[in-house]
A protein has these predicted regions:
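Helix-to-loop junction immediately C-terminal to a conserved catalytic motif
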Residues: 50
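Conserved ABC transporter NBD signature motif
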Residues: 58-73
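Conserved ABC ATPase signature
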Residues: 145-149, 153
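A short, proline-enriched helix->beta-strand linker immediately N-terminal to the Walker B motif
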Residues: 164-168
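Catalytic Walker B motif of ABC-type/P-loop ATPase nucleotide-binding domains
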Residues: 170-173
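ABC ATPase "signature
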Residues: 229-230
Length: 259
């Protein structure tokens, strides 16, 4: 079953076109890794998919519900605000810089939106939040504030906060890029666990070994185009496109691919 589709999306900033007719479909339980150089359009695609950026043209579908479609003039028209609020509940987004509420404790970061946006019962929400805190290895940190936590701990809180909304799928935008190398592993471990639990995920990442081991499908982007797409053992370990080979050559010899 398809959970998410983005079809023929185009996006420009002024005279610069950053996405050229991009189409991606993600099935339930699938893990898709998006790789590519800086400026390739990876994060812009994620921001369009999560409606943080508007598309110039294209179609956006979650669970067969159209969040956006092309109007007769070929421009993107979005669903009503009420429909978009509901559709946005289908996914969670984890940023590279955590984006936690600095004046909220760990517990309140997790419970604020489920209680006040989803209007769920506080006792139920707090029970689920405590379980997520345990799952993320953050027991005893419930009343800590973000500035009292390491970067890796803050990112685990951000993942738990996204999961607290009970989304159907998660988007990750370079979840380890703001972390020291020794903290990267703990975040990748959490994402691996989510993959084993069949959480549907789209992950923009520069961790090639991780993408190879965890993703069901890898998309390589460059210059706002999808250059190559397929199984990780094909795209990462045996790419067919010359541009993909050039990009991945930067990682050879670092243990990133052949670890």
């Amino acid at each position: 079953m398809s959970l998410f589709e983005i079809n023929n999306v185009r996006k420009s900033f002024g005279d610069l076109t950053v996405l050229h007719d991009i189409s991606v479909k993600v099935d339930e339980g699938e893990v898709v890794a998006i790789i590519g150089p800086s400026g390739s359009g990876k994060s812009t695609l994620l921001r369009c998919a999560t409606m943080l950026e508007t598309m110039d043209s294209g179609e956006l579908i979650y669970l067969d519900e159209k969040a956006a479609h092309n109007d007769p003039a070929g421009h993107t028209a979005y669903a009503s605000p009420a429909d978009l609020r509901r559709i946005k509940g289908y996914f969670g987004l984890v940023f590279q810089n955590f984006n936690l509420f600095p004046h909220f404790s760990v517990m309140r970061n997790l419970t604020e939106a489920p209680i006040h946006v989803q209007k769920r019962e506080r006792g139920e929400v707090e029970k689920e939040a405590r379980e997520l805190i345990r799952k993320m290895g953050l027991e005893g940190k419930e009343n800590y504030y973000p500035q009292q936590l390491s970067g890796g701990q803050q990112q685990r809180v951000a993942i738990a906060r996204a999961l607290a909304m009970n989304p159907k799928m998660l988007f990750f935008d370079e979840p380890t890029s703001a972390l020291d190398p020794e903290l990267t592993g703990e975040i990748l471990k959490v994402i691996r666990q989510l993959a084993q639990e069949k959480m549907t995920m789209v992950i923009v990442t520069h961790e090639m070994g991780f993408a190879r081991d965890v993703a069901d499908r890898v998309i390589f982007m460059d210059g706002g185009y999808i250059v190559e797409e397929g199984r990780p053992e094909d795209v990462i370990s045996n790419p067919s496109e010359e541009r993909t080979k050039q990009f991945l050559a930067r990682f050879s010899g670092q243990g990133a691919i052949n670890e």
